[in-house]
Amino acid sequence: MEYLKSIGYKDDFLSYLKDLKFTGSIRSMQEGELCFGNEPLLRVEAPLIQAQLIETILLNIVNFHTLITTKASRIRQIASNDKLMEFGTRRAQEIDAALWGARAAYIGGFDSTSNVRAGKLFGIPVSGTHAHAFVQTYGDEYVAFKKYAERHKNCVFLVDTFHTLKSGVPNAIKVAKELGDKINFVGIRLDSGDIAYLSKEARRMLDEAGFTETKIIASNDLDEETITSLKAQGAKVDSWGVGTKLITGYDQPALGAVYKLVAIENEDGSYSDRIKLSNNAEKVTTPGKKNVYRIINKKTGKAEGDYITLENENPYDEQPLKLFHPVYTYKMKFIKSFEAIDLHHNIYENGKLVYQIPTEDESRDYLAQGLQSIWDENKRFLNPQEYPVDLSKACWDNKHKRIFEVAEHVKEMEEDNE
C-alpha cells in the first residue's frame, strides 16, 4: 500500500483495496479439459473492479499452463507408450516457470521430471541421470561409472562424454558385467550425435552382451517432430528426455488467450451484452453470458464438436441438434442421438470456493480420457481436420445483432462529427 501511495494513488482508493475481498463467481473448464480456439475457457461474474483486478493473474496462469500442457500432450501422442521425462529446468525462463512447467508437462502426459522440487511440491515421479561433469571429473568413463554404481543401485549411465560407441557403451557394459546382481543396469543415455544410428548400434551392443532389458534413453533438443523422425528411422529408443522445446513452448512461445467483457449488469438487474469489434475477424468477441457444451455422438462415442450457447439455452431442446460453421454457415450437420456435456464447472460462488480441486494425477487422467473422444482426424499433426466450434442459432443471431448495433452507433458518430 505504501508503494501504491508513493506512485500517486489516493488514500480513499487504497483503503478500499485494503479491505477488498473477491465476492464474485467463476465458472471454468476443468483442468485437463480439451479446449479449442474461440471458446470461453472460463466465465467471471463479479463487480467490475474485482473482475479487472484478477485479469492479469488469470491470463498468466491459463496461457502458460495451457501452452506447456498442450505441447506435452502432443509429444505424448507421438511417443505412444514410451517413457517421457521432463528435463527442462535449465532452459526454463526462470525457476517458477520450471516448477509449474514440470507440473503442466506431467498433466500433459509426461511420466516424470528431473526437477526434484517439482516432484516434492506436486507429487510427480522424479528421474534423471548423472551429468557429463561427473564423468569428466574422473577423466575416465569406466572409473566414473563404477564410482556411480557404488552409490546407486539403479544405474543409468550417460555414455556420450567422450565417444559413445568406442568408450561410453563398452565401459557401461564392462561395469555392469563386473558388478552383476549388485546393481540394476537400468539403461544408458544418449545426449548428442546421430541418435537414430547410435541407438541402433548401442542396442546391438547391449543385446550381444546379454543386456536385452537395458533401456536406451535419448535427449538433445527433442520434441514431437524429432521423435517422429527418429521413430521413422527405426531408432531403438525406449525413453525420451525432453527439455528446451517443451518447457519454453519452443515453436509457439506464447498462447494468446484473452479476457473480454461480454455483458454488464444494469441497475434493474438485467444485463446488456457487450461486443468488441476488430478488422481481424478472429478478434471479434461473442457477446453475452455463455455456456460451452461438448456434443458427443452416442453411436460413435466421439465428439461432433463444441457448441456455444447463451446462458439460458438447453441443447436438448433442439432435436435433432443443428451444428453450423459460424462463418461458413452453409457447412452444417444434424445430430439426432447425442450427449451434451457442460464443460463449465462452478469454481467460486459469491466469493467462496465450492469446487473440489483435482490432484495432478486426476487432471492427467482426465486429459488422457478426453483425447479418446476426439477423432484421430482432428488430432493428426499434418493437415488435421478442423475441430468444429459452433454457435447456437440464438448465440449467432445475438452476435450479429450486436455487430449491426455497433455499426449503427459508429455511423451516427460519423454523422455527428461531419
Residue ranges of model-derived segments:
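Low-complexity, highly charged intrinsically disordered N-terminal segments
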Residues: 1-5
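Short, positively charged
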Residues: 6-14, 94, 319-327
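Buried, small/hydrophobic-residue-enriched core segments of structured protein domains
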Residues: 8, 14-23, 32-212, 222-232, ...
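Short acidic, Pro/Gly- and aromatic-enriched capping/linker segments at domain boundaries
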Residues: 26-32, 338-343
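Short hydrophobic alpha-helical runs that function as membrane-insertion/retention elements
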Residues: 128, 217, 238-241
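Gly/Ser/Thr/Ala-enriched C-terminal appendages of enzymes
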Residues: 222-418
